[in-house]
Amino acid sequence: MIRRTTRRRFLRTAAWTGVGACVWPVPRLAAAGLSANEKLNVGVVGVGGRGASNMNAVARTENIVALCDVDARRLAQAAEKYPRARQYADYRRMLQQNDIDAVVVNTPDHTHAVISLAAMLLGKHVYCEKPLASSVYEARLMADVAARTGVVTQMGNQVHASDHLRRVAELLKAGVLGRVEKVVAVCHKVLRHSGGDLPTDTPPVPEQLDWDQWLGPVPERPYHPAYHPGGWRVFWGFGSGNFADMGCHILDAPYWGLNLGYPVRIEAEGPPPNPDVAPKSKLVRYHFEREEGGSPLEVVWYDGELAPAGEVIEGVSDGVMVIGERGRLIYNFRGGATQLLPTETFAGIELPEPTLTRPQNHYVEWTEACKGRGETSSDFHYGGALSEVVLAGVVAYRVGEPLDWNGREMRAANCPEAEPLIRPPARSGWFPEL
């Protein structure tokens, strides 16, 4: 177990009403300066699907001491691989296991916030899958609590640690394109059940599933196999469709490399919004103010079946084209060589030396930072801001009108109808009282 030391003075003790009206103690954090062979004790929430991949990756260097899943079948499968880990159906009970240093959160988007907040308030380091949350407000809250507790955090956009993405960010930071005029992002993925309707039949809840725990903070609705396992991403309230699923990956390089911050206006197009289900395709257009002034920088996102009419995107497949005064940079998220076009323009230009660190991988960057060795680069401050931008684009699509966006205040002054989507209602007893 990692040696602990009292962290700097934190916010007042948080009360929790979810498990027998217990009160969470003042957090204590893992100490820095650990020996090279000392390992973190890690608890994992959500151990199937993507969660299994994350768990196995962290287990290469650390101890898995606790497993939690609302699906008993998935929990049993994980326990076969990690028989020494204690098993839980309720993450709140898992977090009371005193030897846990860090937590990996792999659950559906709508429970990212409540689990991560509970862990951070106990001083546990957190790795949480992307997008950071299911709403703008939750992503901001997670970033704020991470900053106030001082825990080490990382959002799970794993390609952020790759040499491929970091080289693109370096080129953009160095200004190789000159003044950037536009960013075009494309994702051809279409999620199962997108563009459909909300299920109306009410089959029985499987015996192995704790449906109330699966719902967590969202308003109650009947179980349906379209939601679990795996289909939840396209149903509003649980997930936010294609864009939220892939936006934190594909927009990561230009967001980081161009230091974009918050947009000032967001527009969206696509099929008429369904109040319950995400569409198969959409277009989202952002306008970002520039520090040096002048016309805003435009970032356009296309996903699913929507053809990017009128755009020059040859060579882009699930990636971005950054258009600048000197030419274009083409980056494909899934790999392949980054291109600077036209080739004759850039042939004689000396490209900048690498300036960003190259971690072993995204997980090791986090675990090393938990031990006081280095920092994470997609922490909840960065990952939260990127998630907010993506999720605000989803809001613009759902309300069906442009948003004059105030990112700092998380509101659209011209569209009060957006407020319930920015900060959705939650069932009582799930969010901690801060």
Task: Please describe what each predicted stretch is.
Residues R86-D90:
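Conserved SAM-binding strand-loop segment of SAM-dependent methyltransferases
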Residues A52, A113, C248:
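Residues forming the Rossmann-fold NAD(P)(H) cofactor-binding site
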Residues A113-A161, G175, G400:
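Beta-strand-loop-alpha-helix segment that lines the small-molecule cofactor/substrate pocket
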Residues T107-H110:
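N-terminal glycine-rich "phosphate-gripper" loop used for MgATP/nucleotide binding
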Residues R167, R179, V184-H188, H193-S240, ...:
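Contiguous beta-strand/loop segments that form the cofactor/metal-binding neighborhood of enzyme cores
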Residues M1-G18:
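N-terminal secretory signal peptides and thylakoid transit peptides that target proteins
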Residues A14-Y82, V159-S162, P254:
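N-terminal Rossmann-like dinucleotide-binding module
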Residues V103-V104:
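N-terminal Rossmann-like NAD(P) cofactor-binding module of classical short-chain dehydrogenase/reductase
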